[in-house]
From Swiss-Prot:
Pfam families: Ribosomal_L23
SUBUNIT field: Part of the 50S ribosomal subunit. Contacts protein L29, and trigger factor when it is bound to the ribosome.
Keywords, comma-separated and alphabetical: Ribonucleoprotein, Ribosomal protein, RNA-binding, rRNA-binding
Cellular component terms per the entry's GO annotation: ribonucleoprotein complex; ribosome
Protein name (record): Large ribosomal subunit protein uL23
PROSITE patterns referenced in this protein's UniProt entry, alphabetically: RIBOSOMAL_L23
InterPro entries: Nucleotide-bd_a/b_plait_sf, Ribosomal_uL23-like, Ribosomal_uL23/eL15/eS24_sf, Ribosomal_uL23_CS
Cysteine pairs bridged by disulfides in the record: none
UniProt function note: One of the early assembly proteins it binds 23S rRNA. One of the proteins that surrounds the polypeptide exit tunnel on the outside of the ribosome. Forms the main docking site for trigger factor binding to the ribosome.
Length: 98
């Protein structure tokens, strides 16, 4: 279904909460909604060259927004919180952000 690992990982989540979790080697990403935990784990290990201990996922429903009489909806997305093993190195992309 996926041609490569970059199709699964969409973008990192940079928030105050996700930055605090980086001390525990937990990194948060927006991922493809159809990807499962095994595919996400394989993609993170392949792209960043780290060892993943576990993956927690959650489907986030987009909020309903309105401007005047027009009603719209933000897109739904899937969020993955990836915990690395103790002996694994940190993901270089996030270094210097703490």
């Amino acid at each position: 279904m996926y041609t490569n690992s970059h199709d699964i990982i969409r973008k990192p989540v940079i928030t105050e909460k996700s930055m605090a979790e980086m001390a525990d080697k937990k990194y948060t990403f927006i991922v493809d909604p159809h990807a499962n935990k095994v595919q996400i784990k394989k993609a993170i290990e392949e792209v960043f060259g780290v060892k993943v201990e576990k993956v927690n996922t959650s489907n986030i429903l987009g909020k309903t927004k309105r401007v005047g009489v027009h009603v719209g909806k933000r897109a739904d997305y899937k969020k993955a919180i990836v915990k690395l093993t103790e002996d694994s190195k940190a993901i270089e992309f996030f270094e210097g952000m703490q």
